[in-house]
Amino acid sequence: MKKLTLLETELAIKYIKDLFQNALSKELNLLRVSAPLIIAPDSGLNDNLNGWEAPVSFKSKTNGVSSQVVQSLAKWKRYSIARYEIPLYQGLYTDMNAIRMDETLDATHSMYVDQWDWELRISENDRNVEFLKNTVNKIYKVLKEAQLKVNEKYGIFEQKDLLPEHIHFVTTQELLDQYPDKNPSEREQLVCEKYKAVFVMQVGKKLSNNQVHDGRSPDYDDWSLNGDIMVYNPRSKKALELSSMGIRVNKEVLLKQLEESKQNERLELMFHKKLVNGELHQTIGGGIGQSRLCYFLLQKDHIGEVQASHWSDEIVVEAKAKGIKLL
């Protein structure tokens, strides 16, 4: 396997990002738009993630304005689809930069999050598993083509194909049924080892053991029509999540999921009021990790090799001992 220098790595990062976003926008019919780094705390537009991660917040001493740094743009994108009057079956994407200060740091997790956040306007009739799978297949096609072109240019992998021809679909309940004695991350590891590329469906939905596979905010994804694109990373020998996506909630599903998660107070926020009042279009959307994709396609040992972030002293010392050059 070829080892890239620091400069070669930076050039490869740009190549991958240009290649992937151009292909993705063409495949899904997306227009690039500008995105905010900070938003109003009372707008309801920020991503609450699993519910316990606090966003970075501050109040300006000069103008008194309170702001939150975004954690993702899941709800902002749907709001923007309506604002920009995006036509049916067209959408938008953006370079999303976020800070998640409560993230547990490791080889694939950073406090700095960079991803392509995308959203596509669809119809109410498209709220079904078939449409979801079709969209996943389109994204996987872009991913697989990018992998082949990156390897052709840089010779990263010994084999031509790092990814299988098709992605495997499985629900979180099916994973529980197959591996009842394993925890969710162990189930993901086993299914990724077997199929190499997997779309794990219905994340956030309560399973037969009365637990959820993983937490998901109740006000953007429909928990029965969402999922994560995961791959097996031969470098780390671990499952790697590259994307989280889903068909978004309609009014009925929003009310149901807020009730189930005991978060009905969100109905007082601007975004949620607009959704309940029918002012927002039906959409499908998601986020694709830019650094994660580069980390995977370039077969790096640490995401800090493809992303300039801030790390704990322990991680810096460990990386240096292993010869890992953090950006």
Swiss-Prot record:
Keywords: Amino-acid biosynthesis, Asparagine biosynthesis, ATP-binding, Cytoplasm, Ligase, Nucleotide-binding
Keyword Nucleotide-binding: yes
Cited SUPFAM superfamilies: Class II aaRS and biotin synthetases (SSF55681)
Broad class of enzyme this protein falls into: ligase
EC numbers, comma separated: 6.3.1.1
InterPro entries per UniProt: aa-tRNA-synth_II, aa-tRNA-synth_II/BPL/LPL, AsnA
GO-annotated cellular components: cytosol
Compartment(s): Cytoplasm
Gene Ontology BP annotations: L-asparagine biosynthetic process
Pathway of action: Amino-acid biosynthesis; L-asparagine biosynthesis; L-asparagine from L-aspartate (ammonia route): step 1/1
Pfam families: AsnA
Gene3D superfamilies reported for this sequence: Bira Bifunctional Protein, Domain 2
Reaction catalyzed: L-aspartate + NH4(+) + ATP = L-asparagine + AMP + diphosphate + H(+)
Family per record: Belongs to the class-II aminoacyl-tRNA synthetase family. AsnA subfamily.
Identification of the protein by name: Aspartate--ammonia ligase
Source organism phylogeny: Bacteria, Bacillati, Mycoplasmatota, Mycoplasmoidales, Mycoplasmoidaceae
Protein encoded by which gene: asnA
